[in-house]
């Protein structure tokens, strides 16, 4: 499926990026207040290991629910905290080794989720309060999360992200489609850069021109937003 092909490519790009970081870059503060680069990728590693193992997934969800009950935090925040805390002993080299090793198993595990399970609804409480199908979580959210954290890492450490229309452009187009569905208003959107494109819905609506990555960052809560750009799209 396309979703798993995109996740395979995203994991490859993530590993390539992390392989090139020096010691100072691993400790660079990201725009996620609780995380430097290493801790951000401990979270991603945890998500990948949960995708590769049903047992690990069940363990993480149980621990996250306990943390939510104990600390009154959203389940998503509790899950991320568990993923980081249980891997915080890993050095950057160990983290990278484990991520490389688990990457193909993650894609295989997620791709084998039965259709009946994919249709099951799961409640989420951040950044929106609604119910998602498990298939949406597996195919869309896990991909967007990895992609945005790759962008976060580049912005924390300097340089430019590796972007292409067939990969990043596809992710951005999917974000635009969901954004349009969530606000339901007419618009004209011109996204620049390798991941960009032109998008129009209806007539007479608001008009935007901006970098494609910046657009996604704003919708993910990583920048100032006004008008239709205040519409939350989960990452």
Regions found by a protein language model. Give the residues of each.
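Short, contiguous alpha-helical
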Residues: 27-70, 121-182, 215
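Hydrophobic packing residues in well-ordered alpha-helices of helical domains and bundles
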Residues: 3-7, 96-99, 139-142, 146
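Globin-like tetrapyrrole-binding proteins
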Residues: 116-118
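C-terminal interaction segments
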Residues: 202-235
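An N-terminal domain-cap segment
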Residues: 1-42, 51
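Structural signal for well-ordered, non-membrane alpha-helices
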Residues: 12-15, 19, 48-52, 100-114, ...
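Short, helix-capping/interhelical loops that line the mouth of catalytic, cofactor-
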Residues: 1-2, 50-105, 111, 120-121
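An amphipathic alpha-helical core segment
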Residues: 169-207
